[in-house]
Amino acid sequence: MRHGKVHRKLNRTAEHRKAMFANMSASLIKHEQIVTTLPKAKELRPIVEKLVTLGKKGGLAKRRQAISEMRDIDQVKKLFDVLAPRYKDRHGGYTRIIKAGFRYGDNAPMAVIEFVDRDVEAKGQDSGPVQNEASEAA
């Protein structure tokens, strides 16, 4: 029987899963849109929804709770200062999942998970040293 089994294991240990979703939620908050496999996107959605709700509640304790969940202080700052005010009038449903075909190598179902009413300029912004050097040279 599968009583009480609500989450997918995704063929990872508990520590690996927790770290992966912390990184994915930080990436989603940073870029406001990421491409991943469909099962990972479906598991990431409730984690990010809860983080946005924490941001909307505000306060130091909620900020520390979000830091312990996400482990990225810069993205927690964006969550509380940018995303929380953006969704202050929306009661849940902050993200959407769009199916994006199948991956070439292993035919895995892919999906795009993004914030509703996202900032289009945030995608790809500050994506590491290569883009930073290109933007400084321009």
UniProtKB/Swiss-Prot annotation:
Gene Ontology molecular function: structural constituent of ribosome
Pfam families the UniProt entry points to: Ribosomal_L17
Keyword Cell cycle: no
Coiled coil region boundaries: none
Keyword flag Nucleotide-binding: no
Keywords: Ribonucleoprotein, Ribosomal protein
GO biological process, one term: translation
Chain ranges passing through the membrane: none
GO terms for cellular component: cytosolic large ribosomal subunit
InterPro entries: Ribosomal_bL17 (IPR000456), Ribosomal_bL17_CS (IPR047859), Ribosomal_bL17_sf (IPR036373)
Family designation: Belongs to the bacterial ribosomal protein bL17 family.
Quaternary structure (record): Part of the 50S ribosomal subunit. Contacts protein L32.
HAMAP family: Ribosomal_bL17
Protein name: Large ribosomal subunit protein bL17
Record lineage: Bacteria, Pseudomonadati, Pseudomonadota, Alphaproteobacteria, Hyphomicrobiales
Gene: rplQ
